[in-house]
Amino acid sequence: MMREDRMRVLMAGPDRSVHGGISGVVNNYYDAGLDRMIDLCYIGTMVEGTKLRKLLQAVKAYICFLSKLPHYDIAHVNMASDSSYYRKSVFIRAAKLCRRKVVIHQHGGNFPEFYEKELSERGRRRVRRILSMGDAFLVLGTVWMDFFGAIIGKERITVLPNAIRIPEPKEKQYGVHKILYMGRLCKAKGIGELLAVMPGLKEQYPDVRLYLAGIWEDTELKAKAEALKDYVIDLGWIGGTQKQRYLEECDIFVLPSYFEGQPVSVLEAMANACGIVTTKTGSIPDMIIEGDTGLFAVPRDTKTLGESLSRLLADSDLCRTLGGNARRKAETEFSIDNNIKKLLAVYEAISCREPHHE
């Protein structure tokens, strides 16, 4: 039952069961108790499965959203790019027609390419019109503030980084040469380049192991990984205590993506003091500083990827230093509790109600 004195937020985004970054962010909100501070109702607009299943879920979600909208003060719409943008634009329009305050939460690392290369000028005008409907517009980092600020102006934009629950510190073993990857297993995440550098690293460091945690989206890449199965281990999608165990046991984390928003997996690796190798895309430079909290590789470039991984494999002291610095940065800048305080301040700024603090 809703309490009349509390802020009422209707949130829409991928179903919480979906394997992906936005669902992870939403689940972190629930784990941290956001639903106890406000009256929060979450509607999953997308599920994994067949096209028919996805279509039925989208229709069901929209009907549910329309039925609940009159009872809520704020509609918080989580959006990426491409099909996600088209789905969520319908929800945004409905909320404005119902005279509700709208928070648009932009997560899509591929939005610049979608906006600049895939849309006509007419399509870009539509995007600007939809995005301008937000009473508040949340982005993941400074690069996104600049990009979306050029489209809709910066007045209503707030930087709200992704955040996680920081685990209790544990003694970590470095020099074990265990590399962890977590995320979608596809070309855009740099999996092809990662698999390409592994044979050379295996020659230099015979005990090296690469653990791939995710769902395959490319059968050709999966076949390449299976050919290296002696030292490339396919974990499937992992979560909960199993994910935490690998984050603790692996001394190196790698994410060689072509583009990103702000990957939660990098935050999790930081919080677990991993030596990190990733690419300078999206909001990753807000998290990783070269030579301080991690190392960079150039997207699509096997040379720099192999060199950065080799540096950490060769130097456990460097790995320990980078991991320790990353852990401290995660504690001070990416704690879920601080993130929720910022989110509640955004809600309060556009609503007449106040959150309830237990």
Regions found by a protein language model. Name each.
Residues 258:
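Aromatic "clamp/platform" in nucleotide-sugar-dependent glycosyltransferases that forms part
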Residues 237-238, 245-250:
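Short alpha-helical donor nucleotide-sugar binding micro-motif in glycosyltransferases
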Residues 290-291, 295-302, 311-316:
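Conserved acidic donor-binding segment of nucleotide-sugar-dependent glycosyltransferases
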